[in-house]
Amino acid sequence: ILAALYSVGKPELINDRFIAFHVSGGTTEAVLVTPDDNDIIKAEVVSESTDLKAGQAIDRTGVLLGIDFPCGPELEKLSLGSNENFKIKPTMIGMNCSLSGIENKVKKMISDNCPPYDVAKFAICSVCESLSSMAEAVTDKYGNMPLVFAGGVSGNKMIAQTLKNRFGAYFAEP
């Protein structure tokens, strides 16, 4: 968390409450961070994926499309060929998201011969909308505060730009 603050050039956030997201193949979590006199910060996971993690959804989609693992950057490049505007309603259970439906939908799209660039964009947009729903749920409950994203998936430009526009979020270098 402290490395992410350093990366985004906001070390002063350590003195305030903020939400730190870690979005990778191993975790998809939102952590409420509060200052603590004894331990510098206190961190509490307040929202997470209940099954598949964001990076897993991205990589599994890429592998299904024949992209070498890890797939994030190549999947993002492929998605740029799509002009589709997907209407995505993330699966939320309270403040937590479920991402396993992305893989199921991707498999169906591939079997229905959807263009690979549309499949790629669908997967990325699905992850983005899930992260957006997590951010909305957390800020609805805990109040508006800075959002700091870190982890490999946060390097996706489409996801980063969308969440910056919606929430003024900060993104650490992956």
What feature does the model see in each segment?
Residues 77-147, 154-171:
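A contiguous, well-structured pocket-lining segment that forms one wall/lid of small-molecule binding clefts
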Residues 26, 151-153:
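Active-site metal-binding loops of divalent metal-dependent hydrolases
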Residues 1-18:
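Conserved phosphate-binding catalytic cores of ATP/NTP-utilizing and phosphoryl-transfer enzymes
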Residues 14-16, 21-24, 29-114:
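A short helix-loop
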Residues 1-5, 58-61, 135:
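Buried hydrophobic packing segments
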Residues 25, 169-174:
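Active-site catalytic microenvironments in core metabolic enzymes, especially phosphate/sugar-handling
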Residues 1-2, 49-51, 168-171:
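Short, acidic/small-residue loops that bind anionic groups at enzyme active sites
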